[in-house]
Amino acid sequence: MKATALVLLATLPFWAAAPAPAGSSDESVFVQNLRPDQHESLLYVWTSDADGKDPDFVTVIDADPKSPTYATVIATAATSAGGNEAHHFGYTADAGRIFAGGLFSNRLFIYDVKTDPRHPRLARTISDLAATTGYSGPHTFYAVPGGVLVAMLGSKDGGAPGAVVKLDNDGNFVRASPAPEYMYDVGVKPELNLMVTSSWAHPHNIMKGPAPMDQVGDEVVGWDFTTGKVLQQAHLDKAPLEVRWLHGAAARGGFINCAFGNSVWYWEVKDGKLAFSRVLQLADGSIPADMRISYDNKFLFVSLFGAGSVQQYDISSPAKPTLVSSVAVPQAQMMKLTPDNRRLYISNSLLSNLDGKVPYRVRLINVGPGGMLLDPKFDVDFEHFATGEARPHDMLLK
């Protein structure tokens, strides 16, 4: 097992800009959305028009099993333009707005989902984030008090470096913190005043198709969350993507998946050090694309885009994950876990220039004591919209 120990270069002050949250059903710990005792009623899916000729859109799926329209598309909310590469999106801290990014177009679409959650309203379009922020390739949207952090993959011209950009809740530019080189995802541990970011490739390489391996990042960066100062850098395997902290104020570790290294790493903060260790080496071509940690910190879910499956690991010993269940999902991609840890939604589109020829769908995996099972009643077709075929990527619960 390879390990890289990183010494923090500054004492981490306690996060004092806002109280440390107890937890969230969103990637951002600051989002106040569903509680564990609440069943989701809606699933939002950020969706690309497959041929790029029509506007991209937010798909609204009925997720209430008591509803007569359960597991069907009940609405769509179009953007003001097509060809965006609808990739990731995220809530504001109050879950009243969705910030949805065009990875290739640099557009930002802000949707109101507070007024009528079943019918999102496009409240604002920012036509060029590169012009307003100085950076391009909006990827992760991570809510913080007073706004949203956006992980920008590259500079204004599509090269290096990437950055973490803060926007206010109306999408106005606040500030930018340049990365050493690459950018992909953001994860914050407010109790430690620590932010971790990851790597992929720069926009001008991603838009051409599969980026050459020498143009793909392997760096993970630790930041002072309050000041935006880089504290440390680590080099793992190629394309360390999703930053997933363990849940709860006392947690000091997390997981990150290296897509092109076919590996999963665990990190832990202890005695002033941040250390990374490779804990899973998967088969060549597996391409771990997304990860979710159950809210009781018992299980890690990993989607394998290349292998076409979702795996569930027991992480009671985080440094030694144990496979407990696996289900086949062609081109398994983004996942969304419910706060009660019982349902795992999964999409199957990665990127327009990387996807294979598979039927596009959103599926539901039921998680129980015996492991995972695909729900035959929840199989949502993305092949037959009014505008034709569409590609589902990121998802949010409501």
Regions inferred by a protein language model and the residue ranges of each:
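Short, conserved, GDST-rich strand-edge loop motifs in beta-rich repeat architectures
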Residues: 38, 45-52, 151-160, 198-216, ...
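A short beta-strand motif characteristic of beta-propeller blades
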Residues: 73-79, 123-131, 172-178, 229-234, ...
